[in-house]
UniProtKB/Swiss-Prot annotation:
Molecular-function GO terms, alphabetical: structural molecule activity
Presence of keyword Ribonucleoprotein: yes
Role noted for this protein: Required for genome encapsidation. Forms ribonucleoprotein complexes along with TGB1 helicase and viral RNA.
Similarity comment: Belongs to the potexvirus capsid protein family.
Protein name per the record: Coat protein
Subcellular location: Virion
Length: 236
């Protein structure tokens, strides 16, 4: 492909001048290269998500865990145990880990989580292993412990953990056999609804007053009430 050009000839002259048209597309090279079918069939994309811990994050966490004397041959199991525990208790920054898992050489889950938070969020780490925990829970028919407290129906109970969307994230680590079954549309809807409720309640507990004058606050410490914060969802 050649660069489009504008050929003009001066009046009273036999000499032609060639000028490049402003804004013309340069030759098919560099950043102006146009992909063809071969590219799409052969190119390899590295899947990454800012919602999921990266492989670089895992490498850093692994080194910290080594310093804490977590055995290399059970390190993966220690991670899976921690994430399975988070499916029960939550993966927010405020969540308190309970006890010590059987694969961490006596290092508590709280210390494992603290090491993770030096590199990424606990939820990002949990989403990395969400497919592993999903299969684990289904295999043992053991849903997240707090599914009833969160208001989930029995048929949606396996979706009752706050990093559920990591189960289908392509950046997560999936077992060799794949998912035992994909999450159903009803489970995904239930998980999204639970997340919405948590966010709404959290916002209702925050102070959104622009003034501390009693005429504005009416003596309330928090801002918007739960009833005011809830947005009515359209009927199905």
């Amino acid at each position: 492909m050649t660069t489009p050009a504008n050929t003009t000839q001066a009046v009273g002259s036999t000499k032609s001048t060639t000028t490049t048209t402003a804004g013309a597309t340069p030759a098919n090279s560099g950043l102006f290269t146009i992909p063809d079918g071969d590219f799409f069939s052969t190119a390899k994309a590295v899947v990454a998500s800012n919602a999921v811990a990266t492989n670089e994050d895992l490498a850093k966490i692994q080194e910290i865990w080594k310093d804490k004397k977590i055995p290399s041959d059970t390190m993966a199991q220690a991670a899976w145990d921690l994430v399975r525990h988070c499916a029960d208790v939550g993966s927010s920054a405020q969540t308190e880990m309970i006890g010590t898992g059987p694969y961490s050489n006596g290092v508590s889950r709280a210390r494992l989580a603290a090491a993770i938070k030096e590199v990424c969020t606990l939820r990002q780490f949990c989403k990395k292993y969400a497919p592993v925990v999903w299969n684990w829970m289904l295999t043992n028919n053991s849903p997240p412990a707090n599914w009833q407290a969160q208001g989930f129906k029995p048929e949606h109970k396996f979706a009752a953990f706050d990093f559920f969307d990591g189960v289908t994230n392509p950046a997560a680590i999936t077992p060799k056999e794949g998912l035992m079954r994909p999450p159903s549309e009803a489970e995904m809807n239930a998980a999204q609804t639970a997340a919405f409720v948590k966010i709404t309640k959290a916002r209702a507990q925050s102070n959104d007053f622009a003034s501390l004058d009693a005429a504005v606050t009416r003596g309330r410490i928090t801002g918007t009430t739960v009833a005011e914060a809830v947005v009515s969802l359209p009927p199905p």
